C-alpha cells in the first residue's frame, strides 16, 4: 500500500474510523478557526456592518459552491468503491474524469458567482447599509471559487483512498496564511472588507495547489497524469449518478438557508451580525459531524466494494455514536457560554442578544443534526444518494420555506425563525431512522 493510502476493509473498525476521521476533524478545526478569526478581525477592526456583510456570506457560498462539492463527494464514492475492489485501472479513469470535470465546472462557477451576486443579495433583502460591502466581498471571493472547488475535488480523491492526513497539513498551511493576510490587510494596511475576501482566496489557491502537487508526484495508484486528464463518458455518468443527488441536496439546503437568511436580514444589520457571529460558533459543532460523515462515506464505499457487509453495519453504528455524542457535547458548551462567545465578535448588546438566542434555540438538537448527516453519508457511500436528497429536500427545504411562510403570516418574530432549524432536524432524523431500520439499503 503506497504512502497515504489506507484500505479499511480489514482490521479494527474503531481504530480505522478514528484515525481516518481525526485528521479531517483537525483540518476542519483549523478551517473553522481561520473562519472565526476572520470574523473576529473584521468585527473588531471594521465594525458591525462589515461583520454583517462577511457573516451573511456563508449561505450564498454554500448555495453556489455546495452543488459541486456534492458532486465531489459522489466522485469520492465511485473512487473508493473501485479502490476497495482493487480495480485500479477503472479507479484511474474515474480520477482523471473527476479532475477534468472539476476544471470545467469551476471555471463556469467563477463566472456565475461574479455576475449573479448582486441579484442574490437583493433577493435576500440585504440591508442597503451593508449592500456595497457585501457585493465587494462576494465578487472578490468568487474569483477564488476555482481554487475552492478544485480543492474539494482533490480532497475527495485523497480521502477515497484513505488519505486524510495530507489535507490536514494543507489546511493548516492555508489557515495560517489566511490569518496572517487578514491581519496584514485589515489591521496594518487598514484595507476594507474586500481584503478579507482576498486573504481567503489566496489561501484557497495555496491549499488547492498543494493537493495538486501531491497528486501529481505520489507513487500511489491515485496519481494524476496530466496527459490522461479527460472525460470518460462511462465514468462521468457513474460520478454524476452518485454526485448529482448529493449536489442537489447541498443546493436545496443552501436555497432554504438563503430564504432563512433573507428573513433574518429583515430584522436589520444587528440581527445579521449576531446570527453571523453565532454561525461561526455553531461551526465548531459541525466539526465531529463533518469528520465522521466523510469517514463513514469512505468506509462504507470501500467495504461495499469488497462486499464486507458486516463491517459496514458495525462501522456505521460506531461513526454515528461518535458524531452524535461529540456534537451534543459542543452544543452544551454553546448553550452555557454562548453570550460570551458572541461578545468576542461584537460587544454591541443587540448583536449579543440576537446571537445568544439563536444558540439557545438550537444547542440541544445537535445530536439530531449529526444523526441526519451520518445516515445521509452512509447511504451515499452505499450508492443510495437519491434517498438523502429526497429527505433533505422535503424536510430541510420545503418544510423550512413553508414553515417560514406560515409563521411570517402570523407573527414577525425572529425567535420563530430560529426554531425552524431544530424542527426540521427532528423531522429528517425521524425519517432517516425509519428508512435505515426498515429498508434493506445494504443489499438492495
Predicted regions and their residues:
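Transmembrane alpha-helix boundary and packing residues in multipass membrane permease domains
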Residues: 24, 28, 40, 44, ...
Amino acid at each position: 500500500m503506497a504512502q497515504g493510502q489506507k484500505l479499511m476493509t480489514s482490521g479494527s473498525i474503531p481504530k480505522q474510523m478514528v484515525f481516518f476521521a481525526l485528521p479531517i476533524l483537525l483540518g476542519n478545526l483549523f478551517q473553522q478557526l481561520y473562519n472565526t478569526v476572520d470574523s473576529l478581525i473584521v468585527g473588531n477592526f471594521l465594525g458591525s456592518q462589515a461583520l454583517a456583510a462577511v457573516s451573511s456570506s456563508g449561505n450564498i457560498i454554500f448555495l453556489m459552491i455546495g452543488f459541486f462539492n456534492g458532486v465531489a463527494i459522489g466522485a469520492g464514492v465511485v473512487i473508493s468503491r473501485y479502490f476497495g475492489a482493487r480495480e485500479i485501472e477503472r479507479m484511474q479513469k474515474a480520477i482523471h474524469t473527476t479532475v477534468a470535470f472539476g476544471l470545467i465546472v469551476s471555471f463556469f462557477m467563477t463566472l456565475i458567482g461574479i455576475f449573479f451576486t448582486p441579484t442574490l443579495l437583493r433577493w435576500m433583502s440585504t440591508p442597503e447599509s451593508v449592500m456595497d460591502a457585501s457585493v465587494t466581498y462576494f465578487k472578490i471571493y468568487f474569483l477564488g471559487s476555482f481554487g475552492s472547488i478544485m480543492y474539494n475535488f482533490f480532497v475527495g480523491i485523497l480521502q477515497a483512498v484513505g488519505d486524510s492526513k495530507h489535507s490536514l497539513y494543507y489546511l493548516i498551511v492555508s489557515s495560517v496564511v489566511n490569518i496572517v493576510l487578514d491581519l496584514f490587510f485589515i489591521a496594518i494596511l487598514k484595507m476594507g472588507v474586500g481584503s478579507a475576501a482576498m486573504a481567503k482566496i489566496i489561501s484557497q489557491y495555496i491549499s488547492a495547489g498543494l493537493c495538486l502537487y501531491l497528486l501529481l508526484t505520489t507513487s500511489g495508484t491515485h496519481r494524476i497524469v496530466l496527459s490522461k486528464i479527460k472525460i470518460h463518458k462511462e465514468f462521468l455518468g457513474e460520478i454524476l449518478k452518485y454526485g448529482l443527488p448529493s449536489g442537489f441536496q447541498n443546493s436545496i439546503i443552501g436555497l432554504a438557508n438563503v430564504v432563512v437568511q433573507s428573513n433574518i436580514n429583515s430584522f436589520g444589520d444587528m440581527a445579521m451580525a449576531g446570527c453571523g457571529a453565532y454561525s461561526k460558533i455553531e461551526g465548531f459543532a459541525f466539526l465531529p459531524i463533518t469528520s465522521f460523515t466523510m469517514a463513514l462515506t469512505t468506509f462504507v464505499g470501500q467495504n461495499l466494494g469488497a462486499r464486507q457487509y458486516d463491517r459496514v453495519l458495525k462501522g456505521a453504528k460506531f461513526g454515528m455514536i461518535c458524531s452524535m455524542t461529540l456534537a451534543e457535547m459542543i452544543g452544551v458548551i454553546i448553550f452555557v457560554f454562548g453570550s460570551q462567545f458572541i461578545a468576542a465578535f461584537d460587544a454591541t448588546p443587540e448583536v449579543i442578544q440576537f446571537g445568544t438566542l439563536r444558540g439557545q434555540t438550537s444547542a440541544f438538537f445537535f445530536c439530531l443534526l449529526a444523526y441526519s448527516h451520518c445516515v445521509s453519508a452512509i447511504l451515499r457511500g452505499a450508492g443510495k444518494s437519491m434517498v438523502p436528497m429526497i429527505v433533505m429536500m422535503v424536510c430541510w427545504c420545503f418544510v423550512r420555506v413553508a414553515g417560514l411562510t406560515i409563521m411570517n403570516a402570523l407573527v414577525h418574530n425572529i425567535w420563530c425563525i430560529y426554531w425552524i432549524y431544530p424542527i426540521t432536524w427532528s423531522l429528517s432524523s425521524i425519517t432517516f431512522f425509519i428508512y435505515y431500520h426498515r429498508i434493506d439499503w445494504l443489499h438492495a
